[in-house]
Design a protein with these regions (language model features):
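ABC family nucleotide-binding domain
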Residues: 41-257, 261-264
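ABC-family P-loop ATPase nucleotide-binding domain
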Residues: 1-55, 275-301
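H-loop (His-switch) and adjacent beta-strand-loop-beta switch element
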Residues: 261-274
Length: 301
């Protein structure tokens, strides 16, 4: 499930490789020193993204809202990044822009090296279907369809010529097995618990093998225990399969277990917190390890 490759671009603005930052480097032994200069593929890059909402024509209120005000960051292939911030901080707008659901006022968004907002609406819709998987707080499953049909639906919608219906059937069942609910494949979502429905939603997000999975408060409708189980599944996907995940959450405890947290306030990045793991030096994690220490904080002025 890993995606992407290191791309060599001449233009610095389009540089989709990144060298491990020495400020965030873990100490390494002699046999690991080569990792310090390794380049790491970037799945997502935002460059000075702004989103401004102008007052509607005829509206009595003439307030201009800067929902996003110069947001720039990168997400590496296989990284699990959490977006944290108070209500109204711009988190939802940011996720909508990353997910190509809304165009920015200015700035660039690159997914797998492609400047997606240079595309027209038709091609942008195709990119959204092929490269992005969505997980919503409210699951957004279709109750008249079976669990398996829900998982397969994005593949059917995409109508990929390279993928047959039998391929989609097989992949859907494989994903349901990985997520521990293959035995529910023929049931309807309404017959499942909240945690099981969110597992179906995760499988659906992965069916087209996306470059990026966007999760909007995926544990928000679940109790603490079930929410942690769902989060652990997302963490497993990054650790075991190299899935790239960007998650919006209000849960600071869960955010602290992701690879990196980006705090946003008033449409700007306030700070980034790097939760150090083996992945920070280019080494795949052997298991889903809880990171108890926050070792590096980068304040963004």
């Amino acid at each position: 499930m890993s995606h992407g490759s290191t791309l060599d671009k001449k233009d610095p603005a389009n540089d989709f490789t990144m060298t491990t930052d020495s400020k965030h480097m873990l100490s390494v032994g002699p046999d690991e020193s080569h990792l310090q200069s390794a380049t790491i593929a970037v799945a997502l890059k935002l460059d000075n993204v702004k989103k401004i909402f102008e007052p509607r024509s005829g509206s009595a209120k003439k307030i201009v809202v800067k929902a996003l005000d110069g947001v720039s960051f990168e997400v590496r292939v296989g990284e699990f990044v959490s977006i944290v911030g108070p209500s109204g901080s711009g988190k939802s707008t940011l996720l909508n822009v990353i997910g190509a659901l809304d165009r920015p006022t200015s700035g660039k968004v690159f997914i797998k090296g492609q400047d997606i907002f240079l595309l027209d609406d038709t091609r942008l819709s195709d990119v959204r279907s092929r490269l992005i998987g969505f997980i919503f707080q409210s699951y957004n499953l279709i109750n008249r369809m079976s669990v398996q049909e829900n998982v397969e639906f994005p593949a059917v919608f995409l109508r990929r010529t390279s993928s047959s219906s039998s391929d989609s059937h097989t992949r859907a069942l494989e994903l349901l097995e990985i997520l521990g609910i293959k035995d529910k494949a023929k049931q309807k979502p309404v017959d499942l618990s909240g945690g099981e429905q969110q597992r179906v939603a995760i499988a659906r997000a992965l069916i087209n093998d996306p470059a990026l999975v966007l999760a909007d408060e995926p544990t928000g409708n679940l109790d603490t225990k079930t929410g942690r189980e769902v989060f652990d599944l997302l963490k497993m996907l990054t650790d075991r399969f190299g899935t790239t995940v960007v998650m919006v959450t209000h849960n600071l405890e869960l955010a602290g277990i992701t690879d990196r947290s980006i705090y946003i306030r008033d449409g700007r990045i306030e700070k980034e917190i790097l939760h150090k793991t083996k992945s920070d030096i280019g080494l795949p994690s052997a298991s889903a390890t809880t990171n108890k220490d926050i070792d590096s904080i980068r304040e963004v002025k």
